Amino acid sequence: MVDQVQHPTIAQKAAGQFMRSSVSKDVQVGYQRPSMYQRHATYGNYSNAAFQFPPTSRMLATTASPVFVQTPGEKGFTNFALDFLMGGVSAAVSKTAAAPIERVKLLIQNQDEMIKAGRLSEPYKGIGDCFGRTIKDEGFGSLWRGNTANVIRYFPTQALNFAFKDYFKRLFNFKKDRDGYWKWFAGNLASGGAAGASSLLFVYSLDYARTRLANDAKAAKKGGGGRQFDGLVDVYRKTLKTDGIAGLYRGFNISCVGIIVYRGLYFGLYDSVKPVLLTGDLQDSFFASFALGWVITNGAGLASYPIDTVRRRMMMTSGEAVKYKSSLDAFKQILKNEGAKSLFKGAGANILRAVAGAGVLSGYDKLQLIVFGKKYGSGGA
């Protein structure tokens, strides 16, 4: 009998959305149900993750949001195309809804780099202050600056996920019960890192452009000031002119490292804590597993958040006179000049953004049921 495929519940999506971009965005992993509810998981953004019961080697990470869409081989082409398209619409809706919080997160995270470049007059005092100043200086619509690049990124990322999924699944096909925990664990990190880096290679420049646009504050000083970039195409044009291709990929190496670091923390924590806490009546409890996955997702996300900060701070130096020599140099300079706290700036807004995205996805699923009578692929925020 063929296993029945069902879409993830609202609770599962909420867990997957919480602490997403990032390290932008950013390891997300798919939620996998046991037995007849098993779902083929696609890759996600490495800064955050949904949880699994238990985590398996089928989870591969890239910079995409967690989107539950099956490959053409797993379903008819027409249904696949509908799933892919509706997943894109869902991604666009959820990303657009959460875009204001996303921009605030990026502004707070990169404000020290902006101040050094003379593009911000004084630091933000918090999330509320950042919202208020941005709306006052640039207008309400500016909260969505950079969102176009973020939405566009969904489609090539999903296509690349399908292309790399089967290859790396076969290449690192280790089983925990057959090959042992450590070989399975290493294979999981390798497959996630390889798949993530492969997809990231093609879409990284869009993440770079999104970051630069979001951090392009209009009024750095009293009296206002012009923007550095006029739009997405202008980011590419100016970066290529001043720094060449390398400018579009600044921070790429540390981004790949972030995929492996996040997955290592996530799997390591889950496998270590689950046997200790989920015992007796809690062993088969959905809510207990949900809570554990939620806590571990946040723990791994916060622990790897400094990597996201370093890579984005490196992005901000493209086109500038002074650049970091490497990711290690960036890390050392930030610690020396700004303190460890600076590595976690924007983490609070990141959590809010994920919660907002999860809420929008839940509502969008309900809308699909009303309009189409069924749910199609869902895009993450």
UniProtKB/Swiss-Prot annotation:
Region Important for transport activity, annotated ranges: 311-316
Pfam family, one: Mito_carr
Cellular location(s): Mitochondrion inner membrane
Solcar repeat segments: 78-171, 183-276, 284-370
GO molecular function annotation: ATP:ADP antiporter activity; copper ion binding; mRNA binding
Signal peptide as annotated in the record: none
Family named by the database record: Belongs to the mitochondrial carrier (TC 2.A.29) family.
Oligomer and partners: Monomer.
Protein known as: ADP,ATP carrier protein 1, mitochondrial
